[in-house]
């Protein structure tokens, strides 16, 4: 404990023990607080020996300050103790821990202002920008460094592989950083094919150059000695200006960024070319029934990059069309998320939609709903449907004959005759010809009602015995079919007479 307590001695220790832990409190700092701080530093893998000097305390404060917002109470207490100890080392008069924290904050703000001022002075004293490809030689003069073959090869490879896809524009912007108009023309001249696109690009550059000449007219009078002439539209395009003039405009005071201006014109023309090479409109991007939502979002934003619209319009397209053109499964999920959902939430919610697992789950839910609906409908039908019964005794509805209170009817309930019951009633309903349907106990109506007569000659013709009189068929037929004569329906037949 003696080694840990030897951090302060003499007058500094007396000053330490006069400082209160809290404003207006009775408790004051003691040697045990130094011992505790030393152990905590050891626990946090920090050197406890840093507490012996003001510089060491400052280093500890720098290490602990980022953890104050998310740290535990022990870290905050350790920071307060080290801040108070720093004030004791610096002989700063304080009464409590709160004053020590305020002093530390003042010192940190002062150091930050000094650092910002030094950085500002450094920028003011700095030389002209040395961005590639304009660099300074040993004499401090700006000179041009040509584009490397590797850069040109990368640009040509992008055009060959991607043609004029939307990603060509950011690639061109990255490869042409700080380039002069001459460098930009070199990049455009390396494109062998796509001459129709190159002609469209030239037309756009000529239009922008004419607009530049209209907005920036030439001043009358001679040019003052030591001054550089103002660039025209053709100068910016690199057709009527030399490389030295371009460097002079870009490094002058004030500088005229002819390279950046020409670069904007080229990007404007590339946007038109990309729009031509991407004939698919953003309105035609729709999600397929089995297409994953992630692939649909990729196609959507690729087409959105090719759209020539402001950022506000593109934001509206993203908020509206992305949900509107999704398939029904994803659209149901996206509408449930609401209009304030982020793209990350949309992709997380629609993850797996369209796959076999999702299809099986949706089908199971649909079948469950249909089954429940049918069960409810069946229950409802059985509940609401009431069978209407009719009494055979009195003929009224609502009860059966067994429970009928009316006097019991004698005889058959169907024909009214006595001597038999309704189940044994032989009354049958006649058909449209007036024929009574045969009984169900007999032969069906489509069967012959009598046996057919044999066509063999009588026995007497064969000399086998006495003549057997054949039964008379006509009276029997009349008995079976008494009302089947056509005369009763259509009158006498003149042909039969």
Swiss-Prot record:
Interaction with membrane phosphatidylinositol 4,5-bisphosphate and RNA as annotated region, ranges: 14-33
GO molecular function: RNA binding; structural molecule activity; zinc ion binding
UniProt motif (Nuclear export signal) ranges: 16-22
Domain of life: Viruses
Residue positions where Asymmetric dimethylarginine is found in the record: 408
Biological process, per Gene Ontology: viral budding via host ESCRT complex; viral translational frameshifting
Record motif Nuclear localization signal, residues: 26-32
Residue list for modification Phosphoserine: 148
UniProt region (PPIA/CYPA-binding loop), positions on chain: 217-225
Region (Interaction with host PPIA/CYPA and NUP153): 189-227
Modifications the protein undergoes after translation, according to the UniProt entry: Gag-Pol polyprotein: Specific enzymatic cleavages by the viral protease yield mature proteins. Capsid protein p24 is phosphorylated possibly by host MAPK1; this phosphorylation is necessary for Pin1-mediated virion uncoating.
Keyword RNA-binding: yes
Keyword Zinc-finger (UniProt): yes
Domain-related comment: Late-budding domains (L domains) are short sequence motifs essential for viral particle budding. They recruit proteins of the host ESCRT machinery (Endosomal Sorting Complex Required for Transport) or ESCRT-associated proteins. p6-gag contains two L domains: a PTAP/PSAP motif, which interacts with the UEV domain of TSG101 and a LYPX(n)L motif which interacts with PDCD6IP/AIP1.
More about this protein: HIV-1 lineages are divided in three main groups, M (for Major), O (for Outlier), and N (for New, or Non-M, Non-O). The vast majority of strains found worldwide belong to the group M. Group O seems to be endemic to and largely confined to Cameroon and neighboring countries in West Central Africa, where these viruses represent a small minority of HIV-1 strains. The group N is represented by a limited number of isolates from Cameroonian persons. The group M is further subdivided in 9 clades or subtypes (A to D, F to H, J and K).
Name assigned to this protein: Gag polyprotein
Gene: gag
């Amino acid at each position: 404990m003696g080694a840990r307590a030897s951090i302060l001695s003499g007058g500094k220790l007396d000053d330490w023990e006069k400082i209160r832990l809290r404003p207006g409190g009775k408790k004051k700092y003691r040697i045990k607080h130094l011992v505790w701080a030393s152990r905590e530093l050891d626990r946090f893998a920090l050197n406890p020996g840093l507490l012996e000097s003001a510089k060491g305390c400052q280093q500890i404060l720098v290490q602990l300050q980022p953890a104050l917002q998310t740290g535990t109470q022990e870290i905050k207490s350790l920071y307060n103790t080290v801040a108070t100890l720093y004030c004791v080392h610096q002989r700063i008069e304080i009464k409590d821990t709160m004053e020590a924290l305020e002093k530390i904050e003042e010192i940190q703000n002062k150091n930050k202002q000094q650092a910002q001022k030094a950085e500002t002075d450094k920028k003011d004293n700095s030389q002209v920008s040395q961005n590639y490809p304009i660099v300074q030689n040993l004499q401090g003069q700006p000179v041009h460094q040509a584009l490397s073959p590797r850069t040109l090869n990368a640009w040509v490879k992008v055009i060959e592989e991607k043609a004029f896809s939307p990603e060509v524009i950011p690639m061109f912007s990255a490869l042409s950083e700080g380039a002069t108009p001459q460098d930009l023309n070199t990049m455009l001249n390396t494109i062998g094919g796509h001459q129709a696109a190159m002609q469209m690009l030239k037309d756009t550059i000529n239009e922008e150059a004419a607009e530049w000449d209209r907005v920036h007219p030439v001043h009358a009078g001679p040019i003052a000695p030591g001054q550089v002439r103002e660039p025209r539209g053709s100068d910016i395009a690199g057709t009527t200006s030399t490389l030295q003039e371009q460097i002079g405009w870009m490094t002058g005071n004030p500088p005229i960024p002819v390279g950046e201006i020409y670069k904007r014109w080229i990007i404007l023309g590339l946007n038109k070319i990309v729009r031509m090479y991407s004939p698919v409109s953003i309105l035609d991007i729709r999600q397929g029934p089995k297409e994953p939502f992630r692939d649909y979002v990729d196609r959507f934003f690729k087409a959105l990059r090719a759209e020539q619209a402001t950022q506000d319009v593109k934001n509206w397209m993203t908020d509206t069309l992305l949900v509107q053109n999704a398939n029904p499964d994803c659209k149901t999920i996206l509408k449930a998320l609401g209009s304030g959902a982020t793209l990350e939430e949309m992709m997380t919610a629609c993850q797996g939609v369209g796959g076999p697992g999702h299809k099986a789950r949706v089908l199971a839910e649909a079948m469950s709903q249909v089954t429940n609906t049918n069960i409810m409908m069946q229950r409802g039908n059985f509940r609401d449907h009431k069978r209407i019964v009719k009494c055979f005794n009195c003929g009224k509805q609502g009860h059966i004959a067994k429970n009928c209170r009316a006097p019991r009817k004698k005889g058959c309930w169907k024909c009214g005759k006595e001597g038999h019951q309704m189940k044994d009633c032989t009354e049958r309903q006649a058909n449209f010809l007036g024929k009574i349907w045969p009984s169900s106990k007999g032969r069906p109506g489509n069967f012959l009602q009598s046996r057919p007569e044999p066509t063999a000659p009588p026995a007497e013709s064969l000399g086998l015995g006495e003549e057997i009189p054949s039964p008379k068929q006509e009276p029997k037929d009349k008995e079976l079919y008494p009302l089947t004569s056509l005369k009763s329906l259509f009158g006498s037949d003149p042909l039969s007479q």
